[in-house]
């Protein structure tokens, strides 16, 4: 059973001595923002997703009321852009392109690293009323490693073994990862991993697949530009945490959706055995031990279900069984999905677990976080998250 931290545990952590004083730190090319620029940042948003590369967005005041001119874009001259003056530095501070940006969010004295990114978009707004505002967006530096999409599958391998496999995969005559990039793993974490019966890369960029694989394990995928390495393993910069959240006790809102229409009684995978030249037919149903174990307390809510048959490119009975099991488990994970809001928790990230309490036996329990949005602004620091029910306890949760 995973360990869960309550908000009380978090509040008494000595490193969070100012738990109620949220803040952020942004370093551009290794240098912190000047104090005047910090005051102009009206809102900071960080987002991550198990299926997407993470990034951030800044909302910045772009108006100097004293000079009656735009600060960062909109009042510059050609001469301003060509010099090394203080004005030039401000006008080019958020320019998209080659600049790196490191964002950390948290509470005074204990900021958590969220992302190392590059600026991708600078979007000024000159409204009909009110002062000009600038929106700046940045994406994880992993985005630069998107080259070509591939399809493939792995059976009975650990996550770290699959990740290391990308060091030898080739797309034609070229390495799949842009040379000289390599994947490195954490040997200690790898030794404790269990094999995954089946996982597929479906017309995805390699870096997107690796990121999804990492999040599914509670890991991160971090790029070291200097060493040209992709680190696959537990976070080296901050530790994602599994939280226990109760409605009215830190959990500000929670909106679950219980959907049973897409649940199947069983799935039959059909393929072709090339060696025996005979058809393959493998069926997995709700009575399979692994399927019964996941969200078993909810299966009684599902009405009479249909049996489904799918034709897939499988060439052994074992592979067909793994594909069928993966399909049934994926369906079970979608019985309950939800959107929640809590106080700002920088360690609550996509790929972690939350234990939701106080909403009844059918809905209380363990959820897997698929997406988070961290917003720090005038209203304080709020974390919103999307999640799906993934209880493995063999029964319903307590309320």
Across the structure, where does each feature detected by a protein language model lie?
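Assembly/oligomerization scaffold segments
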Residues: 1-145
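Surface-exposed, non-catalytic interaction/assembly patches
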Residues: 2, 34, 71, 146-155, ...
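Extracytoplasmic
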Residues: 21-23, 39-41, 53-55, 96-100, ...
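An acidic/polar, Gly/Ser/Thr-rich interaction patch typically located in mid-to-C-terminal regions
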Residues: 46, 51-89, 250-399
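A structural signal for the main folded, soluble domain(s) of proteins
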Residues: 101-102, 124, 166, 257, ...
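Extracytoplasmic/secreted envelope proteins and their assembly/folding machinery
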Residues: 116, 160-163, 207-211, 251, ...
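Short, compositionally biased
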Residues: 117-125, 236-238, 367-378
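Charged- and aromatic-enriched interaction segments used to assemble
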Residues: 130-248
């Amino acid at each position: 059973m995973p360990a869960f931290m309550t908000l009380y545990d978090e509040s008494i952590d000595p490193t969070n001595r100012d738990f109620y004083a949220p803040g952020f730190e942004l370093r551009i090319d290794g240098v912190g923002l000047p104090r005047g620029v910090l005051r102009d940042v009206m809102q900071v948003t960080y987002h991550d997703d198990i299926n997407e590369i993470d990034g951030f967005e800044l909302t910045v005041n772009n108006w100097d009321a004293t000079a009656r001119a735009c600060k960062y874009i909109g009042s510059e001259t050609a001469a301003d852009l060509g010099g090394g003056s203080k004005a030039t530095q401000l006008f080019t501070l958020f320019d998209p392109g080659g600049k790196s940006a490191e964002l950390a969010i948290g509470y005074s004295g204990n900021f958590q690293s969220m992302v190392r990114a590059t600026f991708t978009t600078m979007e000024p707004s000159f409204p009909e009323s009110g002062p000009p505002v600038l929106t700046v967006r940045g994406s994880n530096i992993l985005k630069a490693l998107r080259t070509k999409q591939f399809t493939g599958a792995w059976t009975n391998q650990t996550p770290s073994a699959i990740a290391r496999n990308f060091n030898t995969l080739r797309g034609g005559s070229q390495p799949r990862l842009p040379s000289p990039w390599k994947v490195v793993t954490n040997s200690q974490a790898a030794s404790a991993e269990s094999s995954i019966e089946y996982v597929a890369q479906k017309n995805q960029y390699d870096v997107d697949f690796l990121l999804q694989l990492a999040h599914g394990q509670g890991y991160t995928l971090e790029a070291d530009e200097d060493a040209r390495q992709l680190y696959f393993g537990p976070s080296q910069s901050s530790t994602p945490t599994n939280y226990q959240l109760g409605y009215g006790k830190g959990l500000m809102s929670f909106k679950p959706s219980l959907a049973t229409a897409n649940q199947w009684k069983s799935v039959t995978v059909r393929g072709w055995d090339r060696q025996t030249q005979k058809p393959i037919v493998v069926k997995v149903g709700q009575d399979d031990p692994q399927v019964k174990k996941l969200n078993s307390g909810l299966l009684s809510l599902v009405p009479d279900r249909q049996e489904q048959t799918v034709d897939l490119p499988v060439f052994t009975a074992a592979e067909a069984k793994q594909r069928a099991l993966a399909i049934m488990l994926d369906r079970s994970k979608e019985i309950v999905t939800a959107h929640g809001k809590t106080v700002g928790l920088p360690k609550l990230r996509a790929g972690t677990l939350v234990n939701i309490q106080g909403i009844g036996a059918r809905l209380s329990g363990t959820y897997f976080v698929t997406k988070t949005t961290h917003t720090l602004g005038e209203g304080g620091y709020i974390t919103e998250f999307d999640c799906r029910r993934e209880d493995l306890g063999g029964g319903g949760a307590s309320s």
